[in-house]
Amino acid sequence: MRYDFVIIGAGPAGEAAAYLARSRGASVAVIDRDLFGGSCPHWGCVPSKSLLNAASLHAAGGDYPWQRASDRRDYMINRVGLDYPDDTGHVRGLRDAGADTFRGVGRLDGPGRVVVRHEAVEHPLEGRHVMLAVGSETKMPPIEGIDGVRTWTNRDATAARELPASLLVLGGGPTGVELAQVYARFGVPVTIVQSGPRLIPTDHPRNSAAALLAMQRDGVDVRLGVRAVRARPAGDPARPDVIELDDGSTAAGHAVLLAVGRTIPLGGLGLETVGLQAGGVPHDGRLRLQDGLYLVGDCAGPELHTHQAHYQGELAVRMALGDDVAPDYRALPRATYTDPELASVGVTLEEAMAAGLDAFEVVADFPTTAKGYSVEAAFGHVTIVVDRGSRHLVGAAMATPDASAAIHECVLAIKARVPVAVLADTIHAFPSTSRILNGLFAEAARSLG
């Protein structure tokens, strides 16, 4: 069978590509070996945010025990009464849009050719454009004996129906801190081991500091600057497994959550049939590996976000169909949904100056603002970075209760290159986090003269 687009992977990037391609009149085949919809709605973004909300209510004294949180989570991921989420809605949506869906392992079989294998049956497909949207997988850290302990991936952590007696989180990125807060707020003793000097190292340093305060407030034992080197299985379900650290100390947990990063599953895709190697497949900056072959989503970089995957899936379709567009990541937002939320976009002051910009930053201490007073905030910040040369915003970060929403004014300002003077002259509702931004824009405008 021949299609305009053959898409391997039905996560956010693959689904977005399929829907847009069908809306443009293209024929589409979508392949996935596991759940249509990908990790986000079933094991990642959706269940974790449901659990974070439940944990927040529980911590505030609401009637929200773990069983209720678990039941709500199962409802959200279509797993009520099941051992595995039901992706029927995702499959139906694609088919209703006119796409053909294939469950099985898809691999390249030469330029423009894909073979789908399912239960020993192979289906050959041809595509004018082939898109690889295979997502990412949990990275197994190089720790001696790790195979012998009770490890969790993010799937296990977001799907658990029983609370562990204790939890050890290896890795202090967004996944690690979000799930640490969930379990800590339900009364589980939690330890985070982070090899670097700060949590969420890809985010703004002030956000990292806020994340540390949030973890400590909720009773999480955070170990920074130490690396796990050896695992000692307990051999008894009632006792925790022990992880030896490179400073001579130990950390323990009845469950050990692996949150040290992600790997890209490019092996087994048949890349060698088109002259490529799985070990290194850089795209051309326009998501193309070669004519007619695109790489989108987590496997394309530069970061790992569902919203980036959605953007790239649609963008690749537009480029394949001849639109004059190219990727633009200047205004790529990042959000971590802890309490408080953490969000950022663009560059830090240090990054701006390293890039040769004549930049400065303006910072508000969130607890001293009207919004901060109203929510009794103990810590947090709102920061903007401005380029004197262009008089534009080039970066922003915040740790506030609604940061994931409030950051988008800055996302739009960076994307559209809105002058700081215009941002300062725009009326913002009081008291809100956006109003704090308004004050920072005004201060920046005065500094610019």
Segments the model singles out, each with a brief description of its role:
Residues 147-162, 251-320:
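FAD-site-proximal beta/loop scaffold in flavoenzymes
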Residues 8-34, 39, 46, 50-57, ...:
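Flexible, glycine-rich terminal cap/loop adjacent to redox cofactors
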Residues 3-5, 10-84, 182-202, 405:
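Beta1-alpha1 glycine-rich phosphate/pyrophosphate-binding loop at the start
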Residues 45, 133-189, 193, 272-289:
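Glycine-rich dinucleotide-binding loop and its adjacent helix/turn
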Residues 100-103, 107-118, 186-285, 289, ...:
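A Rossmann-like FAD-binding core segment of flavoenzymes
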Residues 77-82, 158-159, 164-168, 174-237, ...:
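Rossmann-like dinucleotide-binding cores of NAD(P)H-dependent redox enzymes
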Residues 40-126, 202-226, 349-351, 439:
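N-terminal Rossmann-like dinucleotide/flavin-binding domain of flavoprotein oxidoreductases
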Residues 6-8, 106, 124-135, 169-170, ...:
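Short hydrophobic core segments
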